[in-house]
């Protein structure tokens, strides 16, 4: 077996490889690069599940970064159990082919209770006093303590949120190096999210000095991994899930459904409104540039479809035939799936008056919000000194007081300059595959995301 390293570099596209990415540029020159024909929605959980299983969303069930759990009548995003994902995974196929095959899965999603030999994933601690304490989950248990002892606490707050930066990717890179050195897995999978942050904050402005710095930083992380892989005699594959393209503002799909009388809310927390998904006739789970629209009354699907199609910023709305064409015909999908125009994205906002927005709307809270919220990448522009404000709230928490980290805007959706999820129009702005083995990446056309699993196995077993 040929030991192999797969580096998932979020948001990396052919257009981003150049003078600021010398290590990746060298890998392309010595090996090969092909576009990746990704799936829809082109979002983290969906694409990673396709890369790992070789199946479309209709086969593995990760129809977005979350979905409406119909039996619970609740929306849940960013679940972590690998048992939610159907299909045979890369590492299971490898072990079936050779029982000596091993796999380390470092920070890919759905990474708890996985059948991979070694794994690690973000997993904060939530004490009853309301704090969120950075931590990670690792299998086996001793790996957790090894990584903490070697690298310190996982930097959760730089993994996502308004202060997200290179330190989380650097920690993941070093944890991967440790596992490669100490466990010698046949296949090592790692995930570097750094480009995701400023590409959404700033858009893919290749002349922006901050983005050029980001490219140099992520290339340095990749360089350390590639150097270690070459030292260990590993093949190297670099892959991305999606490309991030320019956007101007959000489409407030749930507000339109609310105004049409299709969404029900319940007043809680001193009059603040909470989405009552189970009692709503129709609501949308917004996830970047797609939205799953769940319609409880089949007789009203046509009415809801027409309403959404008429909204400014909506490109198309998939019904059953449309979902089948996109590989989204799965029971977890909404009755309808909306896709935005290239320069727009969907917000989850369902309230019509900011005074009654839920308290979590002003915080980084990926689990309570019934949809993805890229505005979490920004401090509220209305706060004069946001870092001081956040520090004061954090100090109160450390003193044992409950304090709401309400430092995120709930209305400045125009802050977001980059998004993803819909099919990318220009392959140069879309995801890619790079391989150190050009003979395994021959041809000029795109690599189908559903073919990536076999491509990895070919690297290991050819």
Regions found by a protein language model. Name each.
Residues 121-149, 210-220, 255-274:
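Acidic, His- and aromatic-enriched active-site or binding-groove loops in soluble protein domains
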């Amino acid at each position: 077996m040929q030991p192999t390293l797969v580096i998932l570099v979020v948001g990396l596209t052919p257009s981003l490889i150049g003078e600021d990415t010398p290590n990746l540029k060298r890998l392309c020159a010595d090996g090969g690069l092909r576009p990746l024909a990704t799936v829809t929605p082109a979002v983290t959980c969906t694409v990673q599940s396709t890369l790992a299983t070789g199946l479309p969303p209709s086969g593995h069930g990760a129809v977005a970064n979350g979905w409406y759990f119909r039996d619970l009548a609740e929306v849940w995003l960013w679940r972590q159990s690998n048992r939610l994902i159907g299909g045979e995974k890369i590492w299971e196929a490898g072990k079936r082919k050779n029982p000596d095959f091993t796999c380390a899965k470092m920070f890919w999603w759905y990474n708890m209770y996985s059948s991979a030999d070694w794994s690690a994933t973000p997993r904060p601690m939530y004490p009853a006093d309301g704090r969120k304490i950075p931590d990670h989950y690792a299998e086996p248990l001793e790996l957790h303590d090894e990584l903490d002892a070697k690298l310190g606490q996982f930097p959760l707050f730089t993994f996502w949120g308004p202060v997200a930066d290179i330190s989380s990717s650097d920690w993941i890179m070093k944890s991967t190096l440790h596992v490669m050195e100490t466990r010698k897995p046949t296949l090592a999978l790692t995930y570097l999210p750094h480009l995701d942050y400023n590409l959404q904050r700033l858009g893919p402005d290749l002349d922006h000095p901050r983005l050029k710095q980001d490219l140099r930083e992520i290339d340095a992380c990749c360089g350390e991994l590639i150097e270690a892989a070459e030292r260990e005699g590993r093949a190297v594959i670099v892959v991305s899930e999606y490309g991030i393209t320019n956007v101007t503002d959000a489409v407030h799909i749930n507000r339109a459904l609310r105004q049409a009388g299709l969404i029900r809310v319940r007043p809680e927390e001193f009059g603040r409104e909470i989405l009552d998904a189970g009692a709503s006739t129709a609501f949308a789970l917004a996830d970047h540039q797609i939205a799953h629209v769940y319609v409880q009354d089949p007789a009203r699907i046509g009415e809801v479809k027409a309403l959404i199609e008429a909204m400014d910023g909506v490109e198309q709305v998939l019904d059953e035939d449309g979902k089948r064409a996109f590989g989204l015909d799965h029971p977890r999908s909404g009755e309808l799936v909306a896709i935005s125009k290239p320069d727009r994205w969907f917000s989850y906002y369902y309230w019509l008056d900011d005074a009654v927005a839920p308290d979590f709307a002003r915080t980084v809270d990926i689990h309570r919000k019934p949809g993805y919220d890229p505005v979490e990448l920004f401090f509220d522009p209305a706060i004069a000194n946001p870092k001081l404000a956040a520090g004061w709230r954090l100090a109160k928490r450390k003193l044992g007081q409950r304090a709401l980290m309400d430092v995120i805007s709930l209305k400045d959706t125009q802050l977001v300059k980059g998004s993803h999820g819909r099919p990318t129009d220009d392959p140069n702005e879309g995801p890619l595959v790079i391989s150190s083995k050009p003979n395994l990446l021959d041809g000029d056309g795109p690599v189908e995301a559903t073919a990536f699993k076999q491509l990895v196995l070919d690297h290991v077993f050819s």
